[in-house]
Regions:
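Membrane-proximal helix-turn-helix segments that form the acceptor-binding/catalytic region
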Residues: 81-85, 125, 140-169
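Conserved donor-binding/catalytic core segment of Leloir-type glycosyltransferases
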Residues: 170, 195, 203-221, 227-230, ...
Length: 382
């Protein structure tokens, strides 16, 4: 199968989805990826990627210089000839479009070649949380007079348009699978965010007195909770060190903890991928207070066989099976239980790894993407 991938960013170091697409290509399929050269790393750092990259049957053409240029009708017109030549020569069977912002380009190609579109979004639109999807655009419509109502209405219109354009829709958000947003006869699928990890050298040297959190310090990560829970954990359990890796809006929370517990709080602004994985692997447990998102850190914890403690069940966590699901006021007892019960520690550790392999690994997600592509092509040709 020939799959045309239109994506706002693809890089084997910074994008776990890269490895899902690579697994599809390695399964006797061809993928032509159209993207841009801009890489937004954790912490907001901008980097430039090379224009052409060939990795077996996965071929990437970053013909646009930036995400903004890729989304601009005028700039896309300037690259029209180059884009048309690439796509015509490739002759795709299906268009795999990441995010609504790329849908107009996907629609143009669909009209010319007569192939189905699969739209993959991080979140489906939810009128109760209008800024979760298309937040940057919809916040333009927020005002004191109408509040969120206008933004919600506009978001609903855009979402209905997206459904009318797509032949299948994929969301990476677990709660979307529970709500099954209105689909207008368009198949809707939930496919988890993938996690990829390279082979990590060396044996696990787990520090029983250390825990870890890695990720962007953004409001939805709910770091304010840590001002209550971390002091309790440090003072009432065997934990002696909590290591944070990341930066962002709520950096002040970590700084406050550092002032109160200078010998116990470690903060690293940025760390390489392999170093992050080793840090997770060698820590006794991971802790995420996030109310949504944080999928990369969660998946990495499962992949590294490190138990993860969560205080909000936004990812279909199974308590005492693949994670420890608790409340802030009960977290001390649950941490103590991990320390005191080897069987519980082992059960959560192995259960998380099993979930990673079956549902969240690059190969598992890639296989699901390919299955949806085949279904879309079959239905489209009927």
């Amino acid at each position: 199968m020939n799959i045309l991938l239109i994506t706002p960013g693809i890089n084997k170091t910074f994008n776990d989805n890269y490895h899902s697409y690579k697994s599809i290509a390695d399964d006797d399929n061809n993928i032509l990826a159209i993207s841009n050269q801009e890489i937004v790393a954790k912490g907001g750092d901008l980097r430039k990627d090379k224009e052409v990259e060939i990795d077996g049957s996965l071929v990437i053409h970053r013909i646009f210089k930036s995400i903004r240029e890729q989304q601009s009708f005028v700039r896309r017109f300037l690259y029209k000839k180059k884009l048309n030549n690439l796509v015509s020569e490739f002759r795709p069977d299906v268009i795999f479009c990441e995010e609504i912002s790329n849908l107009r380009l996907a629609m143009k190609i669909k009209r010319e070649l007569g192939v189905p579109i699969i739209l993959r979004t991080e979140f489906a639109f939810d009128a109760d949380y209008p800024y979760r999807s298309m937040g940057r655009l919809l916040k333009i419509f927020k005002n004191p007079l109408t509040g969120d109502r206008l933004a919600s209405a506009v978001g609903g219109l855009i979402w209905r348009w997206a459904y009318s354009c797509a032949d299948s829709v994929i969301s990476c958000y677990y709660e979307d699978a529970l709500k099954q947003p209105e689909v207008y006869n368009t198949p809707f699928y939930y496919v988890p965010w993938p996690t990829f990890h390279p082979n990590i050298e060396g044996e696990t040297k787990r520090k029983k007195d250390r825990a870890v959190f890695i990720g962007a310090f953004e409001p939805h990560k709910n770091l304010q909770e840590l001002l209550v829970t971390i002091p309790e954990i440090l003072e009432k359990t065997p934990l002696k060190e909590f290591c944070f890796v990341g930066a962002g809006h709520d950096l002040g929370v970590i700084q406050q903890l550092k002032i109160s517990y200078p010998d116990s709080i470690t903060h690293i602004r940025s760390l390489g991928r392999e170093q992050c994985l080793k840090l997770i692997r060698d820590s006794f447990f991971a802790y995420s207070p996030a109310t949504r998102g944080g999928w990369g850190f969660i998946g990495d914890s499962w992949a590294m066989k490190t138990p993860i403690i969560v205080t909000h069940n936004h990812y279909g966590f199974n308590d005492n099976i693949d994670s420890v699901v608790t409340a802030p006021q009960d977290i001390v007892n649950r941490v103590k239980s991990l320390y005191e019960n080897d069987s519980e520690f082992e059960r959560v550790r192995t259960g998380g790894f099993k979930r990673y392999v079956e549902n969240h690994s690059a190969n598992a997600v890639g296989a699901r993407f390919l299955e949806i592509c085949i279904l879309a092509c079959t239905k489209f040709s009927e």
